[in-house]
Amino acid sequence: MVLDKMIIFHLLLWLCNVVVHAAKVEILPAPQSVTWENDTAIIINPRLLQANTSCPLLEDAFVRTVSAIEKSKWHPFPIDDFNTANGKNIKTSLVHIQVDDATVDLQLGVNESYTLKINTDGINIHAATTWGALHGLVSLQQLIIHTSEDKYVVPSSVTISDFPNFKHRGLMIDSGRNFLTVDSILEQIDIMALSKMNSLHWHLADSQSWPVALESYPHMIKDAYSNDEVYSKNDLKYIVDYARARGVRVIPEIDMPGHARAGWKQVDPTIVECADAFWTDAAVEPPPGQLNIESEKTYEVISNVYNELSDIFIDDVFHVGNDELQEKCYSAQLSPNNTVTDLLKRYLKKALPIFNKVNHRKLTMWDDVLLSDVSADKIPSNITLQVWHEISGVKNLTSRGYDVVVSSSDFLYLDCGNAGWVTNDPRYVETPENVDFNTGQGGSWCGPYKSYQRIYNFDFTANLTETEKNHVLGREAALWSEQVDSTVLTTKIWPRTAALAELTWSGNKDSNGHHRGYEFTQRILNFREYLVKLGYGVSPLVPKYCLLNPHACDLYKNPPVY
């Protein structure tokens, strides 16, 4: 009899714990620390909330937060509806936002930590900087859920202590291959802010088009696709300011000396090499073109373009390219005593002083400059390398003392798996039975498609020493736009890139070191629904059945622990 009572007691306790657990709202990215109390639901009227802050940026962010709460009427799955009869109204409508130092600028490595406390006494956000407080508001926005009684509640009192694991949590977009409208770029910034990503790397131009209007060389935009596909100086400044207001840095990239044709040749055709060659003879994709490293005019133009853009883009970091330099483009200049490596070294010797004249400048380059067949012996150790080749490059570079941003094409190239795009390619006709051609039928050079699970499971600091790990600034997903424009930009990126957001914010392991992909599944599926509620056209990841029936679509009934 006593045993039966004990069994019943423990069963009831287990059921109680299940109910308590099910009622908790999980936000994305998962915070470092969340403590839920076992008390009653807190009823909040978002229309009555007011921010207790003197910071205009935070006041505007608070207005957006309240608007999103009311617009989304968010209720995550599979949380049961709340009976608010036993709930308690919050005692004050003031949201207290305390910032220790509101003067700190948004730059690489800024303190983004925050603490959020919600109970019946009120809502309090405490952060070291304005940028941490923005993250606190984003978390608050996801925690307040809507009920069938048309009320808004937080399931119980909760305390969140949070900070990111990595300084750089990035996304790269490319407006050189296909134009991206201002509105489509702003949408990416919105979703980045919602997922606490902080770095938008903007590959502004490429050999195909130059969409950036410059006062120093106004005729460069003759190589824009049309008059409607141009970014004015005001457009650029608006995007930078819009992003900053949401805690997102905008890092510009002008790819040099490779991938350079459009725009540059409008200034002076002599500063571009191999522009008239057929592309397969001189480039990795059409059209060909690289800057003439031997011409003094080249460096005059580089200086003027770079300085004007540095006045517009306020971030300390500027990406100056240096990828995929093609030896065959310089065939007319090469000799046994003047190799393409010699040309690259000469370019760096002349270009680096130009780049470093800007105060507080931090340069980023693609890893090609040290790891490709055409590479320099060394570059200054204060240059950050973006690793897109083999993942072994991370250890190679960090062991040599370089900071890196990881963008492995095997895990983080979002354009992969979309099939080849070069037209009239007879190889598809000649070898239809060869499923291995160009990584298989479809011809994507970097297939397969990078799913959210592939992204989330990527351990990008594996086999690194602690010293080497300290040189990893973070990770960045990259979407090259050969097959992307504004019509599909958001759906190509989201919600799978939210896996990267969590991976770089709090990681993919729990406090015991166990992989938490099992619990992340429902978190990212809900985050997708949340984005849809806010009006964003993001891709479904699974049939909705899987969202409504958590883990019914898992491969294994009893998932392995690893």
Swiss-Prot record:
Instruction: Write down the top EC class of this protein.
Output: hydrolase
Residues bearing attached sugar chains per UniProt: N38, N52, N111, N337, N382, N396, N463
Q: Which residues form the signal peptide?
A: 1-22
- Explain the purpose of this protein: Has a broad substrate specificity.
Keywords, ordered alphabetically: Glycoprotein, Glycosidase, Hydrolase, Signal
User: What does the record give as the reaction this protein catalyses?
Assistant: Hydrolysis of terminal non-reducing N-acetyl-D-hexosamine residues in N-acetyl-beta-D-hexosaminides
Q: Which Gene3D superfamilies match?
A: Chitobiase/beta-hexosaminidase domain 2-like, Glycosidases
Q: Name one GO cellular component term.
A: membrane
Q: What is this protein called?
A: Beta-hexosaminidase
Q: Which family does it belong to?
A: Belongs to the glycosyl hydrolase 20 family.
Gene symbol here is HEX1
Task: Tell me the Gene Ontology biological-process terms attached to this UniProt entry.
Answer: carbohydrate metabolic process; glycosaminoglycan metabolic process
